[in-house]
């Protein structure tokens, strides 16, 4: 994370992140800025928050251009089970350039068994350059997912 800072006693300080988003608002498409700056997507008490949600799938696709099967792009589709287990949160990244998944062998935070990556602790969106954005996600295991993309979709499906 570049703008969301961990507190020494636990938790995260979003103040610098909110300021950063204000400073880059004009360079983000409205729907990406709306997602990034909506406190509901970060708030521990919001049912729509990614905080405490569980990753269920992270699919990397290479769809072919209908005009030429040789031309392909990278797309990532993610599905999270909401923290109250009553909804799915879908994130879709189009025009993906760089993407990384880093997971430590040992867990950073308890519980330490049979939890996969654990719950999502915090996430932030950033501007990489004109037309390219990054979404970084940190999980309780210590896993970090990073996607650089040109287009983004977000939707919620109630169960």
Q: What is each residue range found by the language model?
A:
Residues 1-159:
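Surface-exposed, interaction-prone regions used to assemble/regulate multi-protein complexes
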């Amino acid at each position: 994370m570049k703008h969301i800072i961990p507190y020494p006693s636990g938790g995260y300080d979003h103040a610098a992140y909110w300021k950063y988003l204000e400073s880059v608002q004009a360079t983000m498409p409205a729907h990406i800025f709306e997602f990034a700056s909506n406190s509901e997507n970060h708030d521990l008490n919001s049912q729509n928050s990614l905080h405490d949600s569980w990753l269920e799938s992270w699919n990397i696709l290479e769809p072919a251009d209908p005009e030429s099967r040789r031309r392909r792009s990278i797309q990532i589709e993610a599905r999270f089970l909401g923290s109250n287990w009553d909804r799915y949160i879908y994130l879709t990244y189009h025009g993906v350039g760089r993407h990384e998944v880093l997971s430590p062998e040992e867990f950073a935070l308890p519980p330490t068994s049979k939890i996969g990556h654990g719950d999502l602790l915090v996430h932030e969106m950033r501007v990489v350059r004109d037309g390219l954005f990054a979404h970084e996600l940190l999980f309780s295991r210590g896993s970090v997912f990073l996607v650089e993309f040109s287009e983004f979709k977000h939707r919620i499906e109630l169960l």
